């Protein structure tokens, strides 16, 4: 469909702008994790010139992940006047939830493996709740960070978690690492 990635980038930015106009929303909320997909998504949303709220939501994240997301957000705020950010550390909320489930006296029994999966999915769902709190409060939409393989290939996302978004700017394309470098020429990651 496109001969070079700059056309894909421009197409996505135009599509994001059109989506906002057609749906009477004012901007975007993006969860920035420190990964490539959230860096790409937040940069593309920033390129629309519409307000973008970048949110860090650590739940016992590694220092490296937090540093990467912080550095990317700082770069966005320096290069795009439409970007603001907030850090909502959800570790204590998650810990309280885990504690309540571990202390529940019940006749129900859970396998450790399934319980750990449920706790992992809970992290994603807590983040989704937080993203939508901010989006609804500002008349913004949640821009998902899932890529094509995650969203349409292997279906690697948590239902009602990181799969619970309004729009997925990078899920319909084959954007890859070289494309990230091209976006970097526009504004960087």
Language model features with spans:
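ATP-dependent adenylation/nucleotidyltransferase module used to activate substrates
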Residues: 1-158
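Exposed boundary/loop context
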Residues: 28, 180-181
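Ubiquitous "structural anchor" signal
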Residues: 39-43, 163, 173
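Conserved small/polar residues in nucleotide/adenosyl-binding loops
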Residues: 173-179
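Hydrophobic alpha-helical segments, chiefly the membrane-spanning helices
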Residues: 184-189
């Amino acid at each position: 469909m496109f001969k070079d990635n700059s056309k894909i980038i421009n197409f996505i930015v135009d599509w994001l702008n059109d989506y906002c106009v057609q749906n009477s929303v004012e901007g975007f909320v993006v969860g920035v994790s420190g990964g490539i997909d959230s860096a790409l998504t937040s940069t593309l949303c920033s390129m629309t010139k519409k307000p973008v709220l970048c949110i860090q939501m650590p739940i016992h994240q590694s220092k490296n992940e937090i540093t990467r997301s912080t550095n990317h957000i700082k770069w966005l705020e320096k290069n795009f006047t439409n970007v603001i950010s907030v850090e909502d550390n959800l570790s204590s909320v998650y810990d309280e939830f885990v504690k309540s489930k571990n202390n529940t006296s019940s006749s129900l029994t859970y396998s450790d493996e399934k319980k750990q999966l449920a706790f992992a999915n809970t992290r994603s769902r807590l983040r989704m709740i937080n993203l939508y709190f901010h989006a609804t409060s500002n008349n913004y939409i949640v821009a998902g960070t899932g890529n094509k393989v995650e969203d349409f290939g292997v279906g690697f996302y948590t239902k009602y978690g990181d799969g619970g978004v309004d729009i997925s700017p990078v899920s319909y394309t084959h954007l890859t690492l070289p494309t990230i470098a091209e976006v970097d020429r526009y504004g960087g990651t």
